[in-house]
Curated annotation (Swiss-Prot):
Region (Disordered) residue spans: 579-619
Matching CDD domains: ASKHA_NBD_HSP70_DnaK-like
Biased composition (Low complexity): 583-596
Organism, scientific name: Levilactobacillus brevis (strain ATCC 367 / BCRC 12310 / CIP 105137 / JCM 1170 / LMG 11437 / NCIMB 947 / NCTC 947) (Lactobacillus brevis)
Upregulation: By stress conditions e.g. heat shock.
Top-level taxonomic group: Bacteria
Protein name, as recorded: Chaperone protein DnaK
């Protein structure tokens, strides 16, 4: 039976994390390497799928490595091709989720079927739906999709429910940026506004360093490293490391020997990057985050001075220039009480506890990040639900036909803030047919938008005259059907089984190697101490196992391994018993000798007088 626990997952662009509620406290679950975050990297090698640190480590030499897939979630038609097979962002994300799920299950000691997954607050409907699909493919029932800044606020405010505070969460991750303004009080987490940029994050800061290195190297050596895939991967790793180093030191050394080759032999890259130069290179990126901060405050109808607490979330907020900028804009020293890499997963676990009832007296009121509406006459975008409306919510509006005797209306569903439909994001299209013939403007068509607690949109159109209704649940723009998701789920399960089988094979082969080594050692130890027949029996079993190993017959290897293990165990027991017996005989002889020595003792004993010396007598 599966655990009733709901795990909290921060599915990040660069790194991901998973947490679970223990009692009333959320706890990060470390991965198998002992790290509290896991690189969001997937690699394919020799038919095996690798996820996390092991995938990231070999990215330089393996072209079949996928990173930052989150930046393509909900992107129509986007696929990654590996060895002739195409993978959608949902499938790749599902592999990361499966990996997190697996070590969470190891920690909990039970099967996990439910999760709360976080997304950037500024993710649109298609991106949210794609995230939910990824969870489904990974074998998880996604109980709730919540916004990352909101999750961070939950982690911060869980033990501060008696305080009334206005909180600004500045969330700069690996590939996305969000800012949310919340009001906390009496256990209610009320999101007042949210804003952001789904294509701005730490990866962009890395790219600035890479561009600087490429330009400098080209100027010095006449070689363009941007054309060399392997060199680019090395540059990316070095840029990321330099960025992290500059959070603690004022100058970082970048050393990449043998990065390329010129006419006179190998070329090496040696550079020093000062924090001041890094700040200069990335100043425009930091500045890009200012407008969303101002807009979020404006939408919440607040001034910067009204904010009580500023929370920094996301690894990129460790950059000193970012911290200084936020402090300058808000007039507040950022709160550092929560780990920016872990807060989102912890908050997701808290929300999981709210759903199961393990966390009491906490109410989360989130908002929709973008306005929703339909296209009307002249290509105009008519909003039905404004951005920053608390969800879940429902809104209806009555429209009519644009021509006489119009038999059908096309409903073009959009999300965005621009006045013209063409400038906004299309979520879907559907048609309401069989409208009775009538003059233009007479039919009454009621369009209703429903947004559920996950921010997923449902739209219906109803002819008020005939009560005929048509509904649509907005799917991700990848357009994954239920059948496609089902197929991907089955593939994911098959891959999981294949990975388990492959691991079992490797474990068995390792055990066989270890047993053969142990057998040779034991046979040397027992030589001359057990009968030749027993040694021959062990040697025959060893040779049979070697033959199964050479044939790579797994079942035969298991059987022969068990046979040899029993024989070697029996020999080891005999050897141990023999050693004990010899030790016992030796002890007995030693005891007799000791008695004899004791009898002789008086003949050579000299008694001595002694007296106590008092140190005070010497003074």
């Amino acid at each position: 039976m599966a655990s009733n626990k709901i795990i909290g997952i921060d599915l990040g662009t660069t790194n991901s994390a998973v947490a679970v509620l223990e009692g009333s406290t959320p706890k990060i679950i470390a991965n198998k390497e002992g790290a509290r975050t896991t690189p969001s990297v997937v690699a394919f090698k020799d038919g095996e799928t690798q996820v996390g640190e092991v995938a990231k480590r070999q990215a330089i030499t393996n072209p079949n490595t996928i990173s930052s897939i989150k930046s393509h979630m909900g992107e129509a038609g986007y696929k990654v091709s590996v060895d002739g097979k195409d993978y959608t962002p949902q499938q790749v994300s599902a592999m990361i989720l499966q990996h997190l799920k697996a070590f969470a299950e190891d920690y909990i000691g039970d099967t996990v079927e439910k999760a709360v997954i976080t997304v950037p607050a500024y993710f649109n409907d298609a991106q949210r739906q794609a995230t939910k699909d990824a969870g489904k493919i990974a074998g998880l029932s996604v109980e709730r999709i919540i916004n990352e800044p909101t999750a961070a606020a939950l982690a911060y405010g869980l033990d501060k429910q008696d305080k009334d505070e206005k909180v600004l969460v500045y969330d700069l991750g690996g590939g996305t940026f969000d800012v949310s303004v919340l009001e906390l009080g009496d256990g209610v987490f009320d999101v007042l506004s949210t804003n952001g940029d789904t294509h701005l994050g730490g990866d962009d800061f890395d790219q600035k360093i890479m561009d600087w290195l490429v330009a400098g190297f080209k100027e010095e050596n006449g070689v363009d490293l941007s054309k060399d895939k392997m060199a680019l991967q090395r540059l990316k790793d070095a840029a990321e490391k330099a960025k992290k180093d500059l959070s603690g030191v004022t100058e970082a050394q970048i050393s990449l020997p043998f990065i390329s080759a010129g006419e006179n032999g190998p070329l090496h890259l040696e550079k020093s990057l000062s924090r001041a130069k890094f700040n200069e290179l990335t100043a425009d990126l930091v500045e890009k985050t200012r407008i969303p901060v101002q807009n979020a405050l404006k939408d919440a109808d607040l001034q910067a001075s009204d904010i009580d607490v500023v929370i920094l979330n996301g690894g990129s907020t460790r950059i000193p220039a970012v911290q200084e900028a936020v402090k300058s804009w808000t007039g507040k020293e950022p709160n550092h009480s929560i780990n920016p890499d872990e807060a989102v997963a912890l908050g997701a676990a808290v929300q999981g506890g709210v759903i199961t009832g393990d966390v009491k007296d906490v109410v989360l009121l989130d908002v929709t990040p973008l306005s929703l509406g339909i296209e009307t006459m002249g290509g105009v975008f008519t909003k039905l639900i404004d951005r920053n409306t608390t969800i879940p919510t429902s809104k209806s509006q009555v429209f009519s036909t644009a021509a006489d005797n119009q038999p059908a209306v096309d409903i073009h569903v959009l999300q965005g803030e621009r006045p013209m439909a063409a400038d906004n994001k299309t979520l879907g299209n559907f048609q309401l047919t069989d409208i009775p013939a009538a003059p233009r403007g007479v039919p009454q068509i009621q369009v209703t938008f429903d947004i559920d607690k996950n921010g997923i949109v449902n739209v219906s159109a109803k002819d008020m005259g005939t009560n005929k209704e048509q509904k649509i649940t907005i799917k991700s723009s990848d357009g994954l059907s239920d059948e496609e998701i089902e197929k991907m789920m089955n593939e994911a399960k098959e891959n999981e089984e294949a990975d388990k089988k492959r691991k079992e094979e490797v474990d068995t082969k390792n055990e066989v190697d270890q047993l053969l080594f142990q057998t040779d050692k034991t046979l040397k130890d027992v030589k001359g101490k057990v009968s030749d027949d027993e040694i021959k029996k062990a040697e025959d079993a060893r040779d049979a196992l070697k033959k199964a190993q050479e044939a790579n017959n797994l079942d035969d290897m298991k059987a022969k391994k068990d046979d040899l293990t029993k024989i070697i165990q029996d020999l080891s027991v005999k050897l141990y018993q023999q050693a004990q017996s010899e030790a016992g005989d030796g002890n007995a002889a030693g005891a007799d000798g000791a008695t004899a020595d004791a009898d002789k003792k008086d003949d050579n004993t000299v008694d001595g007088d002694f007296h106590e010396v008092n140190d005070d007598d010497k003074k």
